[in-house]
Amino acid sequence: MKEFRKISVIGLGLIASSICLTLRQKDPTIKLVGYDKDKVVRNRAKKIGLCKVESKLDNAVSGSQLIILCV
């Protein structure tokens, strides 16, 4: 199976949080980048250290080998 070094997660709600935490446990070195249109949700994700959070969608997906939609 292909190994992904950068994964973007679009939508940072409950499902995305579970996915990010699982990916982080599986490989702590993986680059996880998230985006949500809701600023409150983005701030919460930042606060708990879920992933690197971007405020612009194009920044979140740039260079990603895998994009997971959780909307």
What positions do the PLM features span?
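Rossmann-like NAD(P)-binding element
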Residues: 57-71
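NAD(P)+-binding Rossmann beta1-loop-alpha1 motif at the extreme N-terminus of oxidoreductases
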Residues: 1-54
